[in-house]
């Protein structure tokens, strides 16, 4: 600044400059330096408010930098994980591409393992000798096993045995024990190899292990010539129920004479074989139980099997609880098959199984229920003549060249007149036992099996006998039987007209059965339960039994309505003069007049 400039400066301005300080260090920096001053540190972000000093870093900036470092570290770790996942996906995709690019594999069935570690395999319709991959141990391979082959026909994997194929019936196992003769469709016979699972024991019907036996159904591969497993066949297993029934003679009422007859026919030959041999007496081969429905034919057959098992166990000194016998319950109608020869085949299998069980010294009872449905008189068929071949098959099994030892055939039927006479002749079904309808004495015995002392009895009924429960139950039974068997107007059931013009009144007692008595007792128990729910007083009363009898009689009102009254009478157990007309006389349940049953107008009803 020149001298003239100093003189030209106003006084006020001079005071301001002098007040700022005389030295340049104390003056304003803008007045000291001709150039702009640059600070040593510039914050990265603009700050609002006053300017910060140019030296040092505050704590807020350090925290912000640390947060940025943490964020970058997290992003870096996430990026590394993403890269790893991408790498794994690339590796998996590469493996998938390599797998898809491989040539297809073939399969074969192992026939034989050679000493030089080569293997005979049946594949693509050819028998070939192949080599194994080093990771295959030939000692662990089994005949019939499925093998996987690569494109060079090298065995690379050992698989399981086949589980699908054709079903054939085993005829016999050949002498070497490794092959079998089987019969396929249309009786085509072939020899097949037995796979490893069939060389030993297989699972039987009862869950026990056993050897293969003729009649077993086998799963086979006809091309490879192998049988892989035994297949349980429902059509045969359902027809034959191997069991030891738990029904004893003491559970059967009113059939004392019939029980004695069948015990003499069945049990004596088994228990006293020496005496029969000394007297040269041949035991009977079969027993026919015939009579009206619901009178205990099946119960007797079961009791025979149970009693026979216990008696033989006792004779041998075995535990009676472990007594063993076989009761083959044959459901007659299910044996019938529309294919020619199938029914006969089932009969052969049944008796073949019975012979196998009997060969162990155990008695076997073959029980044919509803025998008239399958073994009816030859030539009597309307739609088919299936009985012309089924009946001879049974005859040959019972009385053929191949005898039956320890096997008893028991047949049950309510139409014995329809069974072929050749079956009923002596030497086949030798013993014929009629199971009759129960009379009053037998009915009391049957009632005592169901009205037991453990049942709750009403207090009023007990008080009549001084609290004696046994006397009360016996009195109930006597009064109920007297009511059922009374020839009163309330018990009239039918008026029957015979071909000669005679008429006869039939009562409900003429159609009583053990099954009906059980039903009466069950109804009375239901009435006792309902009465207890209504009144709160527990116990069975005589009136409950009387009400049950009325309901049972009323429900049987419609049953005689059949196409042929004579056929109905035969099933019901009434035989003799031919019946041409039936008129119901029930007055309990139906409010209408008595109904007549005419053979000419009522057609198409059930038997």
From Swiss-Prot:
Disulfide bonds: none annotated. Pathway: Protein degradation; proteasomal Pup-dependent pathway. Keywords: ATP-binding, Chaperone, Coiled coil, Nucleotide-binding, Proteasome. GO terms for cellular component: proteasome complex. One of its GO terms (molecular function) is ATP hydrolysis activity. PROSITE patterns: AAA (PS00674). Residues 606-607 are annotated as: Docks into pockets in the proteasome alpha-ring. Homohexamer. Assembles into a hexameric ring structure that caps the 20S proteasome core. Strongly interacts with the prokaryotic ubiquitin-like protein Pup through a hydrophobic interface; the interacting region of ARC lies in its N-terminal coiled-coil domain. There is one Pup binding site per ARC hexamer ring. Upon ATP-binding, the C-terminus of ARC interacts with the alpha-rings of the proteasome core, possibly by binding to the intersubunit pockets. Belongs to the AAA ATPase family. Consists of three main regions, an N-terminal coiled-coil domain that binds to protein Pup and functions as a docking station, an interdomain involved in ARC hexamerization, and a C-terminal ATPase domain of the AAA type. This is Proteasome-associated ATPase.
